[in-house]
Amino acid sequence: MRKSKEKGRSGSTRPPQLKKPEWVKMRPEEVEELVVSLYRKGYPPSMIGVILRDQYGIPMVKAVTGKSVLQILRERGLAPEIPEDLMNLMKRAIRVRKHLEEHPKDYHSKRGLQLIESKIHRLVKYYKREGILPPDWKYEPSKIALYT
């Protein structure tokens, strides 16, 4: 079983230059307020970008405001403690662990869990190095259920 890195090639192409398109009529402050209100409604940062693209016609938040969605949330003190990609991987690991409790002989899922947890450890190392997670933060599957 390979580490699945080649999946998901489809997706919209990013604009070649980071400039505000002419058709976007919203001011940067309005876009920032939209980002904050969507986050308060419970949408994660990745979904906020998709919603702004699909429903409001804003192709890239950074092109309009000069800041990414996470930068806007950090300025307002709203950014999540644990980065979204890491949280999603941890939720996946919890689901696989729960499955393995019921089906302990499922060796394919055991291997999948190993791959997921390896990816978690690599991400944690990166986030500690970048200062996003505290240096003493540790991935412990038993305690992670409290975060999710």
Swiss-Prot record:
Pfam families: Ribosomal_S13_N (PF08069), Ribosomal_S15 (PF00312)
Nucleus as UniProt keyword: no
One of the GO biological process terms: translation
Domain of life from the UniProt record: Archaea
Keywords: Ribonucleoprotein, Ribosomal protein
Region of interest (Disordered), residue spans: 1-23
MF terms (GO), sorted A to Z: small ribosomal subunit rRNA binding; structural constituent of ribosome
One of the record's GO cellular component terms: cytosolic small ribosomal subunit
InterPro entries given in the database record: Ribosomal_uS15, Ribosomal_uS15_arc_euk, Ribosomal_uS15_N, uS15_NS1_RNA-bd_sf
Similarity comment text for this entry: Belongs to the universal ribosomal protein uS15 family.
Oligomer and partners: Part of the 30S ribosomal subunit.
NCBIfam families assigned: PRK08561.1
Protein name (Swiss-Prot/TrEMBL): Small ribosomal subunit protein uS15
Organism: Thermofilum pendens (strain DSM 2475 / Hrk 5)
Lineage: Archaea, Thermoproteota, Thermoprotei, Thermofilales, Thermofilaceae
